[in-house]
Amino acid sequence: MTDLPPHSSHHPADQGEPLVPAEKKQGVEAIREALKTIPYSPGVYRMLSEKGEVLYVGKALSLKKRVSSYIRINQLPERLRRMVSMTVSMEIVITRTEADALLLEANYIKRMKPRFNILLRDDKSYPWLMLTESHEFPQITKQRGKPVKGATYWGPFANAWAVNQTLNLVQRSFLLRSCSDAVLNSRTRPCLLYQIKRCSAPCVDRISKEDYAELVSEARQFLSGHSTELQQRLVAEMEQASQELNYERAASIRDRIRGFASIQGSSTINPTSINDADIMTIWQEAGQSCIQVFFIRGSRNNGNRAFYPAHAEEETAADVLSAFMIQFYDNKPPPPSILVNCELPEPKLVEEALSIRRGQKVEILRPQRGEKKDVVEHAALNAREALERKLAENTGQRRLLEGVAEVFGLPEIPQRIETYDNSHIMGQAPYGVMVVGGPEGFNKRAYRKYAIKGPVTPGDDFGMMREVMERRFGHRSENGERPEDWPDLLLIDGGLGQFNAVRAVLADLGVTGIPIVAIAKGPDRDAGREWFFTETKSPFQLPPRDPVLYYLQRLRDEAHRFAITTHRAGRSKGLRSSELDHVPGIGAARKKALLNHFGSAKSVRQASLEELENAPGISSSTATAIYGHFHPEWVQKTSADNRSH
């Protein structure tokens, strides 16, 4: 348990100024030049290319000694030789300690994503269980993002499924409400959760404040890892209720005890000897790594997640795990213990850095015996199986991409395929979308939505596609070089017209070297009979059972799915807009308060000035502004009366 999940992490303040060589030298000579002014202090260094791209970020106890190692070029592996050859300048930031440098290095790597560093690819936020404290009947719910002041949190959980499962089971055992304060205050009869024994219905006084407070106390005790003592007490209460012939209460307590058993038995890993810890294991194969992280809180498994950090093939498991660990905890507090399956190169330094981030001591352990060792081995087995599955998938994916290259005559296997589609209804809520596929499947972090800004004639899909292409490729690099995030293949959902529209836009923008393919549905829009339009071939079809055809259909269908969901979300947002959105001085909070009080925007518009002034959270001046917005003739009359006096 913790008072708040982190919203901002501890990052050492930047100290010192960037040091850049006065002359534009490159490679070893550029590093020699930088060494003239680099101190022996601890800190972080950044190696930059001629275009200003950050190639690598590193930390050191002694910056001068560490950077000096790069001038011994023959002792470096090929990857680092290439990095040094591209370096034209260096920047440094001095820190107080090496641990501070390690934290700052991780922060820079996550922000700048240097191509020669080990990178944590998946950096999603994690859900937490939150117990509010601002109401006499506290609410338990799940929460992500910015913490709510004064609330108590448990977590993190690996994913939404894990937190939902625990939330449901906690509701079954403790009957705490999950509804918002507004819903609680507006209820006149119990909701369905009360009927299915998931809530005690404090909204209609089916439970006293004292009894509800007792349930809250028990929930705290359970979620904080003291379930054994709680279960023993409840068993005693159940037996006493039975002896007193209070069978209804005994049955209620029995159901709660069963809920505990459900929580504890819902995972294969529920270690009794581990209270709060993360289990972090790595498995390497074929130059790739998988890291499995299990979240153990209160001796319960809060789920696990697999990560596949990007790194060079020669990186060792220990180096990858160490770099991953520091980046992983950049925006979340580490637990008191982290269990690993290999020795880190600098475990004490990592412990010191994570202890700074947590504000308390953090211990990194590699268990040698007992239950902890068994749990770590189980997590490592999960990492191995996940990596083997991914390698098998990547092998199949590579064959498909080889087939795509062969079908369309590409010079090499495409690493980035961008697929585009549009969606609108008679010109309303028009959106264009881009989805990205490659060797590792769909890259959803690279997906893009384009809300069409220009006027759209109903049915003018060509005009929509032109705007999307102009916005996607309109910004070129200053030196004319191809940006790194440009695609190796453009796949357009449409026929010859869409193909010609896209080709014309790219020609107008001076964009060359990007193959364009349009995929059009066949007769009667039958899947498997699609026509393909390219710049180098006459329109053609692929055999109905060709795996490459299936893959291209998947790309098109994913773009279509994303376009439809984006369009629907845009339409829904438009439908949710209200007359109150246009009233000056009315933000989201006041809008919500007005709708809760009056029931609808129409009722607000029809309300008298006195009724508006009596609404909760609405001041006299705000009420006047609202009334005046809906009654401009009243404003004119009032102004005229004031002038006459």
Swiss-Prot record:
**Span list, region Disordered:** 1-20
Annotated UVR domain ranges read: 228-263
- Which controlled-vocabulary keywords does the entry list? Cytoplasm, DNA damage, DNA excision, DNA repair, Excision nuclease, SOS response
Where it sits in the cell: the answer is:
Cytoplasm
Function field: The UvrABC repair system catalyzes the recognition and processing of DNA lesions. UvrC both incises the 5' and 3' sides of the lesion. The N-terminal half is responsible for the 3' incision and the C-terminal half is responsible for the 5' incision.
Task: Kindly give the HAMAP family that the UniProt entry links to this protein.
Answer: UvrC (MF_00203)
Family affiliation? Belongs to the UvrC family.
Recorded protein name is: UvrABC system protein C
Which gene name does the record give? uvrC
